[in-house]
Design a protein with these regions (language model features):
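Short, flexible helix-loop junctions that flank or precede catalytic/ligand sites
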Residues: 1-347
Length: 347
C-alpha cells in the first residue's frame, strides 16, 4: 500500500490518526484506541520514502537538520492531514492526524449555545484548552466558522501548521502558517495589530511573548481565540500567570481579569454505543466574580464559582459528565475515567 491508500483506508475507518513506524505494520487510532492494520510490517526505507516524498524542499531541510518536522498535507477529495515526521529506535516514523475537509458546525458537535455567543463577542480572550487530541482545533474551527457565517469582518489565523481551511464567507479570512508564511507566532501577532483584524486565532499560546501579545490584542479591542494544553480553567489561569516573571504577575492578573471572556476546557469521551466520541466541557466565563478572583489571585475558589454559575452558562466538567451519563450518551465507567472527582460516578 502506498501513503495515499493508507490514508484513504484511515479516513474510511473514521480514524483520527495514522501511525507509521519502521519495523511494525501501520496502525490507526479509532475512537481513542490504536489498532494494527492487517498488512506486513514496514521497513525504515519504506516509511522514510512515504513521508519524504510528500515533503516540500524546506520541510525536507528541516527534517534533515532537526530530525523531525511538522507540516500539513492534503489529498484532494479526501482530507487534510497534520503530519509529524520523526525518528525512533527502529528507524523512520510519522503520525498523520486527519483534519476533515468539512468543518463541523457547533450544532453538529453538540456544543452548548454559549459557544456561539462567545464567537460573536466584539473583543476579549476566548481560550479552548485540553490535552493533545481532545478536539480543541475542531471546536475552535466551528466557532470561527460560526463567526464567518454570521458577521462581516476580518478573521486572521496564525497556525503551525494550518489545519482547517476556512473559505471567506461573510468575513474575509486570512490564514498564516508558521514557517512558510511567518517566522513565529509572536512575529505574526505583532504584525496582526496592523492588519485590521476583528478576530485573531492563535493556534498555540506556547511562550511568554505569544501570550503577552495575545493578551494585548484582546485588551486593545480584538476578539482573540487561543489554545493551551491545560486540563481545567483554574490551571489555565495559573499557567498563563506562571509564565511571567514575579514583577509582572500583578499586571498580568489585571490584564487577564479585564480581557478574559471564557475558558473552555474539554476532553473526549467514548460514546456508550461505541460508535465514536463526544466532547465534555468545563466552561468558565469572565463574570464579575471570576474577574475578581483572577485579580485577587484566588484561583482555588474558581471551581465553586463555576459550580454555582449554571444559570450564566458555566459548568464544571463533572456536571457535564453527569448530564452525559443521565442522557445515556456515555457510561458511568467512562465518566469516572475522565472526572475530576471519580467517586461521584459509582458503578
Amino acid at each position: 500500500m502506498d501513503i495515499t491508500q493508507l490514508l484513504a483506508f484511515s479516513v474510511k475507518n473514521k480514524a483520527s490518526d495514522l501511525h507509521l513506524s519502521a519495523g511494525l505494520p501501520p496502525m490507526i487510532r479509532v475512537h481513542g484506541d490504536v489498532r494494527r492494520i492487517n498488512v506486513e510490517a514496514l521497513d525504515h526505507k519504506t516509511v522514510h520514502s512515504m513521508v519524504y516524498d510528500i515533503m516540500s524542499d524546506s520541510q525536507r531541510k528541516t527534517y534533515e537538520e532537526f530530525l523531525e518536522v511538522d507540516f500539513s498535507f492534503e489529498i484532494g477529495g479526501l482530507a487534510r492531514f497534520r503530519v509529524n515526521a520523526f525518528n525512533q529506535h527502529r528507524g523512520a516514523a510519522a503520525v498523520f492526524r486527519t483534519i476533515p475537509s468539512k468543518i463541523l458546525t457547533l450544532e453538529e458537535l453538540n456544543c452548548p449555545k454559549i459557544f456561539g455567543d462567545l464567537a460573536l463577542k466584539p473583543r476579549g480572550l476566548v481560550l479552548v484548552t485540553g490535552p493533545t487530541g481532545s478536539g480543541k482545533s475542531t471546536t475552535l474551527a466551528a466557532m470561527v466558522n460560526y463567526l464567518n457565517e454570521t458577521e462581516y469582518g476580518h478573521i486572521l489565523t496564525v497556525e503551525d501548521p494550518i489545519e482547517f481551511v476556512h473559505e471567506s464567507k461573510k468575513c474575509l479570512v486570512n490564514q498564516r502558517e508558521v514557517g512558510p508564511m511567518t517566522l513565529s507566532f509572536a512575529a505574526a501577532l505583532k504584525s496582526a495589530l496592523r492588519e485590521d483584524p476583528d478576530a485573531i486565532l492563535v493556534g498555540e499560546m506556547r511562550d511568554l511573548e505569544t501570550i503577552r501579545l495575545a493578551m494585548t490584542a484582546a485588551e486593545t479591542g480584538h476578539l482573540v481565540f487561543g489554545t493551551l494544553h491545560t486540563s481545567s480553567a483554574a490551571k489555565t489561569i495559573d499557567r498563563i500567570i506562571d509564565v511571567f516573571p514575579a514583577e509582572e504577575k500583578e499586571m498580568v492578573r489585571a490584564m487577564l481579569s479585564e480581557s478574559l471572556q471564557a475558558v473552555i476546557s474539554q476532553t473526549l469521551c467514548k460514546l456508550k454505543d461505541g460508535t465514536g466520541r463526544v466532547a465534555a466541557h468545563e466552561i468558565m466565563l469572565g463574570t464579575s466574580a471570576i474577574r475578581n478572583l483572577i485579580r485577587e489571585a484566588k484561583v482555588a475558589q474558581m471551581y465553586s464559582s463555576i459550580q454555582t454559575g449554571n444559570s450564566l452558562g458555566m459548568q464544571t466538567l463533572d456536571q457535564n459528565l453527569t448530564d452525559l451519563v443521565r442522557r445515556n450518551i456515555i457510561s458511568p465507567a467512562e465518566a469516572r475515567s475522565k472526572a475530576k472527582i471519580p467517586e461521584n460516578f459509582p458503578g
